[in-house]
Amino acid sequence: AEDRKSLSGLTEQEAQEFGTLYTQGVAFVAVIAVVAHALVWAWRPWLQ
């Protein structure tokens, strides 16, 4: 198998690892945002 660098400078394995971490990070931030919105909605509802 070729271990040639891509345009990003990452190997396929490194790109897979980065993609996994990036996806987990985005999901974590999304969960925090949903929880924050739920707490604010419970405190002071909007769009009644």
UniProtKB/Swiss-Prot annotation:
Annotated function: Antenna complexes are light-harvesting systems, which transfer the excitation energy to the reaction centers.
Keyword Membrane: yes
Organism expressing this protein natively: Rhodocyclus tenuis (Rhodospirillum tenue)
Short name of one Pfam family: LHC
Protein origin, superkingdom: Bacteria
Positions on the Periplasmic side per record topology: 44-48
Residue ranges, Cytoplasmic side: 1-20
Keywords, sorted A to Z: Antenna complex, Bacteriochlorophyll, Cell inner membrane, Cell membrane, Chlorophyll, Chromophore, Light-harvesting polypeptide, Magnesium, Membrane, Metal-binding, Transmembrane, Transmembrane helix
Protein name, as recorded: Light-harvesting polypeptide B-885 beta-1 chain
